[in-house]
Amino acid sequence: MNDATPPADELFVTQFLVVSDQERSRDFYQSVFGAAVVRDRDPVILALANTRIVLNVGGGPTDDKPTVRLAPPANPDVSSGFLNLRVRDIAKAYRDWSARGATFLTKPRDHGYEIRAYIRDPDGHLIEVGQTT
């Protein structure tokens, strides 16, 4: 599927992230997670595993959201949502993604039902990396 192709099913979920620098964010998701570029900019669209991530600068309001302004996180320590990446081997993801430039907040922690750790992207968006146990 490219960015103009409608989904084969009735619903296809994408994650939209407001970023301050499209190129920097695109490079981060490509180098750390191996995301493939579907569209280069305005907005950047990346294919990652079985979904798409859309990266665009803030702005607004617009005619279809007349009271809404989009902006990157003002405070990375306050979050109302996050990207959740599920992996088979969190130790491998931690090792590989750290080597590619990801900075984890902590080493993976075992919570009984899952082992998880968190990364921040260049704008401070929180990314959970989790392995179900």
Which role fits each region the language model picked out?
Residues 126-129:
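Short glycine-/small-residue motifs
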